[in-house]
């Protein structure tokens, strides 16, 4: 088993739910990214999603769009993000890291080159927002050949056919987008999520993480009751946007620890 599979197997054995925080690499300061990754892990993150900044992040709301713009303005590239993962791996060989972003930077690097360099850096999974499953078969095969999990999005609008397509090629976990629209938008309806998850789990043989719109421990706990993992991004990016630079890592760790405690409560309830 790879790191993602080991992590979810351990969570299932313990009756706990996964916590998957997202931050944008290089924001607000490229020199702080690895420190922030360690803060997430120390706070209780099970998997870290590291955003690769892109100039046209179509699935992201204004918070993460601003974050991408700041990172790009500071010279962050896919190559520098891979270097961050490699540095993180020097002192954390355990916490899975998933790169989340768009196809263009990967295609510019070359898929084969990306697969080799991501594997060498210690990347465990990759979620490419604009690779639909019906067009991603070759990409998924190349990722798996490099021991990298190809991770896919599902949404409230996903048809049974789309869910089945994802089930055929996904590994690691799938990311269920709990709201229509862009990241950070709207209010969650947990009962609606609960109604969708069984249909996904019946067709997809990997854990289901739920994200978009999760902003606090209470919401995270409610979502954890009906999913395998909770993904939180925009709220963390906002936290880093507003925190004093010297206290940002500590604030991140504290917030993640609060979410971890809430999810562990959900896990106990679910057993």
Swiss-Prot record:
Domain of life: Bacteria
Catalytic activity line of the entry: (1S,2R)-1-C-(indol-3-yl)glycerol 3-phosphate + L-serine = D-glyceraldehyde 3-phosphate + L-tryptophan + H2O
Enzyme class, first EC level, given as a word: lyase
InterPro entries, sorted: Aldolase_TIM, RibuloseP-bd_barrel, Trp_synthase_alpha_AS, Trp_synthase_suA
Pathway listed: Amino-acid biosynthesis; L-tryptophan biosynthesis; L-tryptophan from chorismate: step 5/5
Pfam families per record: Trp_syntA
SUPFAM superfamilies listed in its UniProt record: Ribulose-phoshate binding barrel (SSF51366)
EC number in record: 4.2.1.20
Catalytic site: 49, 60
Gene Ontology, cellular component aspect: cytosol
Keywords linked to the UniProt accession: Amino-acid biosynthesis, Aromatic amino acid biosynthesis, Lyase, Tryptophan biosynthesis
Example of a GO MF term: tryptophan synthase activity
Assembly and interaction partners: Tetramer of two alpha and two beta chains.
Described purpose of this protein according to its UniProt entry: The alpha subunit is responsible for the aldol cleavage of indoleglycerol phosphate to indole and glyceraldehyde 3-phosphate.
HAMAP family: Trp_synth_alpha
Family membership: Belongs to the TrpA family.
Name of the molecule in the record: Tryptophan synthase alpha chain
Organism from which the protein derives: Burkholderia lata (strain ATCC 17760 / DSM 23089 / LMG 22485 / NCIMB 9086 / R18194 / 383)
Lineage of the species this protein comes from: Bacteria, Pseudomonadati, Pseudomonadota, Betaproteobacteria, Burkholderiales
Gene name for this UniProt entry: trpA
């Amino acid at each position: 088993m790879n790191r993602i599979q080991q992590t979810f197997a351990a969570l299932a054995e313990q009756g706990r739910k996964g916590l998957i925080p997202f931050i944008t690499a290089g924001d607000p300061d490229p020199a702080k990214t690895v420190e922030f990754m360690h803060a997430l892990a120390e706070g209780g993150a099970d998997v870290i999603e590291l955003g690769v900044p892109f100039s046209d992040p179509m699935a992201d709301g204004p918070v993460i769009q601003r974050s991408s713009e700041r990172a790009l303005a500071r010279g962050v590239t896919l190559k520098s993000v891979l270097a961050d993962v490699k540095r993180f791996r020097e002192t954390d060989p355990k916490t899975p890291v998933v790169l989340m972003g768009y196809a263009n930077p990967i295609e510019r690097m070359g898929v084969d080159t990306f697969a080799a360099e991501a594997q060498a850096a210690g990347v465990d999974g990759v979620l490419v927002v604009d690779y639909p499953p019906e067009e991603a078969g070759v990409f998924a095969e190349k990722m798996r050949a490099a021991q990298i999990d190809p991770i896919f999005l599902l949404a409230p609008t996903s048809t049974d056919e789309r869910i089945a397509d994802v089930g055929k090629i996904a590994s690691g976990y799938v990311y269920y987008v709990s709201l229509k629209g862009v990241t950070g938008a709207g209010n969650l309806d947990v009962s609606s999520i609960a109604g969708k998850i069984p249909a996904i789990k019946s067709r997809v043989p990997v854990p289901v993480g739920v994200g978009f719109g999760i902003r606090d421990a209470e919401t995270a706990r409610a979502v954890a009751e009906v999913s395998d993992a909770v993904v939180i991004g925009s709220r963390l990016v906002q936290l880093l946007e507003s925190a004093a630079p010297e206290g940002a890592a500590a604030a991140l760790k504290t917030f993640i620890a609060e979410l971890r405690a809430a999810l562990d409560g959900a896990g106990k309830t679910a057993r």
